[in-house]
C-alpha cells in the first residue's frame, strides 16, 4: 500500500510540474510573438512613413532622381503606374513650373498586418511652391498605404491619398 501511495504522490507532483512547464512555455511563446508583432508593426509604420514622404518630396533640379529613388520603395502594379505618372506628369511639371514639394509625416498608424501584407494610414503636411507662386502652399494629406514584404523589406504596393 505504501508503494502505491508513493507512486500516486510522485505522479501527482510530475503532473503539476508538467502543467507548470507548459504554462511557462505558453507565456514565453506568446511574449515572443507579441515582440515580433510589435517589431513588425514598427517596421511597417516606418516603411509607410518614409515612402509616403519620399513620394511627395522633390525639387525641380532633383525631381527625376527623387522620384526614381521613391520608386525603388514600391512594388507591383503600383510601381509601374507611379513610374508612368512621374515620367509624364510630375517630372515635366516640376521642371517647367519649377515646383518644389516637401512632405513631412505628422502621424502614422498601422491598420493591419497579415503575414507579408499590411495596411497603414499616414498623415502628412505637404508644402508646395513654384516660381510663379513663391509663397508656399501648405496642404494636409492623409493616405491609405498598402505594403507587401518582399525579401524582408516592406514595399508600398498602393498609395491612396484622401
Predicted segments with their positions:
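Surface-exposed, charged secondary-structure patches
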Residues: 95-130
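Short, charged, low-hydrophobicity "junction" segments
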Residues: 21-25, 91-102
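Short secondary-structure boundary/capping segments
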Residues: 110-111, 137, 146
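Short, flexible helix/strand-to-coil boundary loops that buttress conserved ligand/catalytic motifs
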Residues: 82, 114, 160
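Short beta-strand edge/turn micro-motifs at domain boundaries
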Residues: 140-162
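Solvent-exposed, non-transmembrane alpha-helical starts
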Residues: 131-137
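Juxtamembrane and targeting peptides
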Residues: 1-57
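Core segments of small alpha/beta cavity-forming domains
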Residues: 39-95
Amino acid at each position: 500500500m505504501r508503494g502505491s501511495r508513493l507512486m500516486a504522490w510522485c505522479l501527482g507532483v510530475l503532473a503539476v510540474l508538467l502543467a507548470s512547464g507548459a504554462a511557462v512555455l505558453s507565456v514565453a511563446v506568446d511574449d515572443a510573438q507579441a515582440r515580433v508583432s510589435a517589431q513588425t508593426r514598427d517596421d511597417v509604420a516606418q516603411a509607410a512613413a518614409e515612402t509616403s514622404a519620399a513620394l511627395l518630396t522633390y525639387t525641380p533640379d532633383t525631381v527625376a532622381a527623387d522620384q526614381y529613388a521613391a520608386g525603388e520603395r514600391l512594388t507591383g502594379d503600383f510601381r509601374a503606374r507611379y513610374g508612368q505618372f512621374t515620367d509624364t506628369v510630375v517630372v515635366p511639371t516640376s521642371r517647367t513650373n519649377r515646383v518644389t514639394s516637401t512632405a513631412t509625416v505628422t502621424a502614422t498608424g498601422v491598420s493591419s498586418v497579415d503575414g507579408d501584407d499590411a495596411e497603414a494610414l499616414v498623415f502628412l503636411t505637404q508644402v508646395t511652391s513654384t516660381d510663379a507662386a513663391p509663397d508656399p502652399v501648405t496642404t494636409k494629406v492623409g493616405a491609405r498605404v498598402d505594403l507587401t514584404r518582399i525579401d524582408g523589406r516592406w514595399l508600398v504596393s498602393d498609395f491612396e491619398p484622401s
